[in-house]
Amino acid sequence: LQNLRDTLSQGMDNVRSSVHDLHDDALDLQVTLQRLLKDYSFCDGTLEYDVLHPLSQQTIYHILAIVKESMNNTMKHSNATKYSITVREQPAFYQLILRDNGTRHSSVPWQTRGIGLSNMQERVADMHGYLNITHTSGFQIYITLPKEDKP
C-alpha cells in the first residue's frame, strides 16, 4: 500500500511539474503533451497528434488542463496500464480523445461527476464544445471543440 502511495505521489508530482508553466505565452501543444506523457510514469502513454492549424493559447491551456485532470483520474481511480491522447483536426472542429485501458477500483460509480470531471465539462462548455464519456474497454473521454475564428 505504501508503494502505491509513493508511486501515485511521484506520478502526481511529475504531472504537476510538467504543466507548471501552463501560462507560458508560447506553449506548443504537441510538445507539452509529449512531455506530459513522458513524465507520466504510472502507465505507458501514447500520443496521436494530427493538427495543421494553430490553436489559440486559451484553447491549448484548456486542453492541457483537461488532459492533466484525466491523467490524475486515471492514476487515482483505475488500474490502467495504458493511456492515450489523440488530438485531431477536422474541417470544422478539433477532436480530443483521452483513453485508458483500466477498470475502476474506486467505490464511486463512474457516472458520478466528481470535481475533476465537472471541471472538464465546464472547460469544454466554455469553448462551446461537447464532452462524452464511455467506459467500455477502459475509460474514454471524447471532446469536440469548434474551431475559433482566429488562433
Where do the PLM segments sit?
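Conserved catalytic submotifs in the C-terminal HATPase_c
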Residues: 46-58, 90-91, 99, 134-136
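Helix-loop-beta hinge of the Bergerat
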Residues: 25-62, 67, 71, 75, ...
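Glycine-rich nucleotide-binding loop
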Residues: 93, 103-104, 135-142
